[in-house]
């Protein structure tokens, strides 16, 4: 997807350009799943892909460290003219406040939810963060394939080893070609089913 705007700086937000600490507030409260998964193990970066509900990749970018809220925020804000209606993300509980503090008007109509698979580990998060909560009252959300991203990410694992031996320039090109083929196959399958 082409870039539609630049990511602004937010000088009134302390640490806006610092490392992303996840959903932890100043008292150390918040979503502890984020910290226990990424903070302790200091996971390295890789690819962050944005998937539609049909597991077609809208785009990707390389990240140097573990994926954080800023990566997702920046991808959404710089590539979509209008914010998506629904964002299904592993750590939507931390992403929603991060986005709303920075661009409240842009994200005012966006629903941020945690997919069914990842919701299990979010023991401190309220039910308002879970897709299943909204499915009970909004039938259209029952049609959302909340595992589309996981399906797509499992496809990316096919090239993980090969890409790890390439220069960054070649790895990006290889990934772009892989995802183009992946997307074409998904789209053809959908056309065949209709």
What is each PLM-predicted segment?
Residues 1-194:
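Catalytic-core elements of nucleic-acid end-processing and repair enzymes
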């Amino acid at each position: 997807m082409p870039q539609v705007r630049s990511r602004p700086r937010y000088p009134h937000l302390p640490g806006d350009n610092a490392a992303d600490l996840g959903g932890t507030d100043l008292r150390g409260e918040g979503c502890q799943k984020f910290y226990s998964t990424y903070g302790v193990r200091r996971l390295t970066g890789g690819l962050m892909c944005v998937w539609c509900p049909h597991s077609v990749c809208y785009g990707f970018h390389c990240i140097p460290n573990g994926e954080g809220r800023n990566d997702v925020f920046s991808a959404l804000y710089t590539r979509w003219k209008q914010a998506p209606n629904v964002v299904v993300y592993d750590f939507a509980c931390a992403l929603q406040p991060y986005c709303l503090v920075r661009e409240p008007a842009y994200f005012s109509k966006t629903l941020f939810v945690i997919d069914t698979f990842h919701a299990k580990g979010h023991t401190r998060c309220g039910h308002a963060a879970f897709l299943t909560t909204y499915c009970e009252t909004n039938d259209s959300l029952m049609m959302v394939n909340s595992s589309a991203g996981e399906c797509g990410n499992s496809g990316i694992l096919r090239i993980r080893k090969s890409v790890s031996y390439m220069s960054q320039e070649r790895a990006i090109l290889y990934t772009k070609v892989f995802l183009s083929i992946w997307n074409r196959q998904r789209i053809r399958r959908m056309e065949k089913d209709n």
